[in-house]
Amino acid sequence: MVSSVKMILALTVLATVACTGYAIKCYQCDSLTNSECGKDIKSDSSLVLDCTKMAPPRFLQNFFPVRNATGCMKQTIDIPGNPQIVRSCYFGNIADTKVGCQTDPSLTINKLLSCEVCTEDECNGTSSLAPIAGVILLFFGLARLLA
């Protein structure tokens, strides 16, 4: 009986962790309107957005049948003589960023200088080991419970 309860608990925890893995959270800001979004962003939860609440930009919607974000991105865009950093959710194929990284074609004066794409929560900002440490602790706690 106790073994069955432990197994159900373990499966519930694993299912919860797996489900939250699909909802990626990314920094959403630009350095033009928010100086905190510059080259070295400080950890600020007010700039973090749950990407499930965001649709792809209108100019990309014809390219992607799936409307879920697949990662986070950090773009450096040159607005004639003034490089700006834009952080947002990424929609598209992580392995082929040509389409997903493009800028709005109606803004013809903007030039994309770089685009970095990643697939972990808040990875388009300052890196943090806190999420990794939490998963490791959860794993060892679950292993101890099942032992």
UniProtKB/Swiss-Prot annotation:
Keywords: Cell membrane, Disulfide bond, Glycoprotein, GPI-anchor, Lipoprotein, Membrane, Signal, Transmembrane, Transmembrane helix. Glycans are attached at N68. Residues 1-23 form the signal peptide. InterPro entries: QVR-like, Sleep_regulator. One of its GO terms (cellular component) is plasma membrane. A lipid is attached at N124 (GPI-anchor amidated asparagine). Residues 125-147 form a propeptide. It is found in: Cell membrane. GO terms for biological process: regulation of synaptic transmission, cholinergic; sleep. The chain crosses the membrane at residues 127-147. Disulfide bonds join C26-C72, C29-C37, C51-C89, C101-C115, C118-C123. It comes from the Eukaryota. May be involved in regulating neuron excitability. Belongs to the quiver family. This is UPAR/Ly6 domain-containing protein CG9338. It comes from Drosophila melanogaster. The lineage of its organism: Eukaryota, Metazoa, Ecdysozoa, Arthropoda, Hexapoda.
